[in-house]
Amino acid sequence: MKNHRLRAFTLTDLLVLVACLSVLGTLLVTQFSRMRANSRRTTCAGNLARVSRAILDYANDHRQSLPAGDPSDHRDIWWWYKEMVKSYAGLRGESSAQDTLFACPEDRGYSSPTPFHRNPHFDYSSYVFNGVTLPGMPNISGLPLAAVKRPERTLLVMEWTAHAPLSWHESRTGRQNAPFYSDAKSVVGFVDGHVSFTPIYFDGYNAAYTQDPINGYDYQYSAK
C-alpha cells in the first residue's frame, strides 16, 4: 500500500511538471513570435526610412520637386518611382528580387500570393509612393516640396497595405487580404522624413488611398 501511494504521488507530480513545462513552452513560443514580429517590423521601418531619404534626395537634385510620371509611359509612377530614386539609395543596375532595401519581410502580396518585393510588375518593391495619379485621387506626384503644406502629416511613401487598408504586422485577417478594415496599421513615411507605424482610416467602402482620413488620424494623402 505504501509503495502504491508513492507511485501515485510520483505520477501526479510528473503530470504537474509536464503541464508547467507546456505552459512555459507556450509562453516562450509566444514571446519569441512577438520578438520576431517586432524585429521584422523594425527592418521594414528602417528600409522605409532609407527609401524616404532617397526620394527626398532625388527631389533635392530635381528643382526640389518630387518624382512625376511620364504621360507617354504606361508604368504607373506610384511603383515605378523606384527607377527614379534607387540610385540615391546606392542601388545600380536592373531592379530584382535581390533589392532587399525595398523589401518588407512581412510582405504577402495582394491579388497574387507573390510578395510585392518579388513581383516584377511592381518593380520588386514593398513600398508605394504617394503618387496615385488616377483622376480625383489625392497625391503629391511631381509637386515641389514647398507645395506640401503639412510635411509632418503628408505621406511620402508607405507599405502597400496603407492603400487598402490592411496590415502585414498586426493582421486581423491572418494571411488573407480581405476584408479591408479601419485602423489597420502600416509602416509609413512622411514628407518631413519621419517614419511611423500608423492606423489607416477606412470608411467601409472606398480604398484608403482615395481620400484623406477623417479627423483624429495623423496622416493625409493630399498636399493641402
Enumerate the predicted regions with their spans.
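N-terminal secretory signal peptides that target proteins for export/translocation
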Residues: 1-4
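Short, well-structured segments within or immediately adjacent to enzyme catalytic domains
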Residues: 42-224
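Amphipathic alpha-helical segments typified by the pilin-like N-terminal helix
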Residues: 6-46
